[in-house]
């Protein structure tokens, strides 16, 4: 590896560099990266921000995102054996807060789900919580694990009630966490991709399309509230306030929390790819695509964007300060090592008993598997450009690489 002092000298040489900031530095078509590059340091100096503080993971992910595709992220050096020109290829950050890296991360996540998913009817289920509970999860991000646990407990309970007629069946399901609504406000909820039916102990798939809504709603509410009680039990004052809120919620939400689990048309059942893409869409990138930004004025420090209100299906245009916009985005950055996508039941990686049955059913149902696409092949496929091909037509040879000291513990990130 190149030493730090040598790296500074190397970056002064005239080389061909794949530096993303040159591509995204356009106010008419601003990227999230550009907006944070221009205003994040000033955002950190705001009195309200200083008072509340910033989570360490936010500072780390933003720093990684800002350095993505630049020499600050590290690089590899290549030399053309024919013309002897030097080429530098900058590393990407692989941050969950990076729009461009997130696209690839989401694509890989979708491919992983497609690889394990059976070609059987699935249902999209959305588990929501009472608005009054949202602040608890905002104060303590680790409580978000409760939403996964509660959704899993609810689904397992619903399918256990089917044992009388169908014997024992195990569904396959994938849970993903979304912490936002379309207006970018804090709204944690669970999206679930659930098989309509399950695998028996003999390895057969039995279909059942009926789902008891009442059990789903009331069961999920009970699981969430009980699990939150356990999590808050060590704080007597907080626990007392929460118990009072729980009593009020049971009175107000007699039918349980809202759970959305519509039937999918038969023609859509045959291809769940679009559903998978939607469920994992924002699990590895910022919660808003840059394409929704309609105007950005760096001098006035204003930004305009739009979203579609799901209740009215009408477009809503928003204009606000860049600082307010930044604040909305960073609160959705998950903690380090927090898994936004989790696998359960027949799809659980630790379910060794059903693994062989799932593999057999997948081959029997002609389920197509997907392979991870590497950086080089991805550029060739999408842009028709080979990053290792010199302009003279010869392939370059690898010389050396450089990773900044601060990122060397995360060397796996630069795959």
Predicted segments, located by residue:
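Beta->alpha loop/short-helix hinge microenvironment recognizer with preference
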Residues: 1-415
